[in-house]
Amino acid sequence: MTGLSRERYAALYGPTTGDRIRLADTDLVIEITEDRSGGTGLAGDEAVFGGGKVLRESMGQSRATRADGAPDTVITGAVILDHWGIIKADIGIRDGRIVAIGKAGNPDIMDGVHPDLVVGPSTEIIAGNGRILTAGAIDCHVHLICPQIMEEALGGGITTIVAGGTGPAEGSKATTVTPGAWHLARMLEALDTWPLNVVLLGKGNTVSAEAMWEQLRGGAAGFKLHEDWGTTPAAIDACLTVADAAGVQVNIHTDTLNEMAFVEDTLAAIKGRSIHAYHTEGAGGGHAPDIITVASHPNVLPSSTNPTRPHTVNTLDEHLDMLMVCHHLNPSVPEDLAFAESRIRPSTIAAEDLLHDIGAISMIGSDAQAMGRIGEVVLRTWQTAHVMKRRRGALEGDGRADNNRARRYVAKYTICPAVAHGLDGEIGSVEVGKLADLVLWEPAFFGVRPHAVIKGGMIAWAAMGDANASIPTPQPVLPRPMFGAAPAAAAATSVHFVSPQAIEDGLADRIDVRRSLIAVADCRHVGKAQMPLNDAMPRIEVDPDTFTVRIDGDVWQEQPAAELPMAQRYFLF
């Protein structure tokens, strides 16, 4: 019997069970725990495409028609990195959804072929061999200031945005809000042709229940409470009361100046109800200096925005300039400068690193163009994981690989925001039945630039060479829009998430969109315990004078990183 070395097998079919993969140039290593597409027990029957290879007529390709159930697309031999595990498999896609994760091929001549992965003449092949597959990222904090952010989002592996805004209006530049039914309708129409799923947030800063209900009927899938509109205890209570009745999520940016409430007053107004706390550390806004303590509470779903991820020697200086612009402050006014400086605290930014690593802060978003970079959600997440491994070593249960840490961090921009916003029945993980919103990465470029972004089963964005070249690979290889980004295809492969009330009120008949409208699931029961791998609730204390942070009684010392991976090695600027 002829055998193959691991090196030879990986070169032919990609790595298999027991093989380890380094993520970009970080210190993070993942290990494949199961191979459903080949390896031991299935070796020799791997489904691979190409000249002289397996997936040919009457070999790996069967006679099965689409009517017989053949998938539209099979991704072969990809290493799936998701919150539920790290395995290798073939992935089948049909009608824009994942139909199977297992072994693809022709059951007439091959063993172990999954019944929903029978390759036929109608099946396209995407080679995932040697590549990593993740669920499309969900950016849970996006300001809709300019349409060009959609391109940056796709280029960073994002396939869903939780967003608000109307363009470069002052309200949108500062707050994640699309206010009122008219603006909601126009923005749903404007976003129809982009290959991204969209969740729009209405304005929750009001004590008028009807003002919120009309926004829900107009297409809002949740609300945003922002201090620049007045996040008073009365507005918090009124907004959550409507949200409870409607089944939608509320996202909050609390009162930095503590004019209307302190953190204790805000928590009292929330009354134990589910709420998504944006930029929980506080540099992006929120009760100074102790908003970070809300991450201790079982009903609060905490997230970070990416400029503070991870804490580096440049973080503080950059934030002061960002803050002055984003909140229309005047550096010559002492009160404005004091406002800015009260929000930028190295001790809480440093503590944010640790809270992510132990799973106490559950999500990471961008705060796009309003103190955040939409193209760096995935990148900043893995930089944080790298910094924490260097400082803290392996997590419990990790040893020769960092599977537990990798699963925790990938969850922060996939399944956790999906659960928080009632989207997890449709997106957020690589699981059967969900939309095929998937990202393929070359391991050397993992988290930096995707090899391909698959939106609803169609390649929407990819690394592509010169279009006038004789083959696809000549330089310059750049992230470029693909056919899945064409307007009609984007509408066919993407969805607008709206409130159930919008569906019931016939919103689809009132607006000019081609994509499907899907109601968010009731997420009012969701608390920290429902955040996969990110459900820790340590005791967090902040000294009001020194801003020293204690986590379960221990002071976390500031050690800002002076050097990061996934940086100058990949980017000129």
From Swiss-Prot:
Keywords: Cytoplasm, Hydrolase, Metal-binding, Nickel. One of its GO terms (molecular function) is urease activity. Binds 2 nickel ions per subunit. Its main location: cytoplasm. Its EC number is 3.5.1.5. Substrate binds at residue 226. Coiled coil: none annotated. CDD domains: Urease_alpha. Ni(2+) 2 binds at residues 224, 253, 279. Heterotrimer of UreA (gamma), UreB (beta) and UreC (alpha) subunits. Three heterotrimers associate to form the active enzyme. This is Urease subunit alpha. The gene is ureC.
